[in-house]
Amino acid sequence: MTGGGGLQLDHVFVMCDAEAPELAALAAIGLDGPPRRSRHAGQGTANACVVFENAFLELIWVHDERETRSPLTAPTRLWDRWAARRSGACPFGIGLRPATPGAVPPYATWPYQPTYLPAGMSIDFAAGTPLEEPELFFMAFTGARPDFRELAKQHTLAPGPITSVTIDLPGAAPLSPACAALQAAGVVSFGRADRHVLRIGCGARAAGRSADLRPTLPIVLDW
């Protein structure tokens, strides 16, 4: 899913409980292929990833509070977002990659250099976004988009590629400059609701089907 400004979606994350028991809700609708699991050394987080044809959904949790709240990692607000995922913080994050060489985000960023990346590489986090909005982060070092089509075939459900991402936000506060710029670029849309909700559109939506995973996960899938 590519927007204007040379950016494209790499993945979306949602904060979840330890070891991602919420995977069962995804499996129940047919997204039941084996998830890719990893730990982020030195960052204190772990994940389980469910692939679509062109991107993936990352369920992420904190497994080491000390690492996640360390001086290196604390500015990412991963701990703050995870700890308050049910009490006001937006539990989502939008991971971006360049679609064209030299592309950069259309908003101010700051570099996060976790220990699991080689020296000189960074993940560029959006500056000035509130916890009530999703985390935005850009990975300039990523190469060509991975082809997940074969992995996606392991699901009973064949939803196709992710074609749209909409995040509903509570309240009436105007969007931060970063989120407004990302919406203008066509990568993600924002709506309003009583609670945070991630809406993922898949394929051509020809099946006309929808799955609301709430309250287990604040996610609605359309395909």
Tell where the protein language model's regions lie, with residue ranges.
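Glyoxalase I/VOC metalloenzyme domain signal
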Residues: 2-9, 14-32, 44, 51-223
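Conserved catalytic-core motifs of GNAT/GCN5-like acyltransferases
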Residues: 33-41
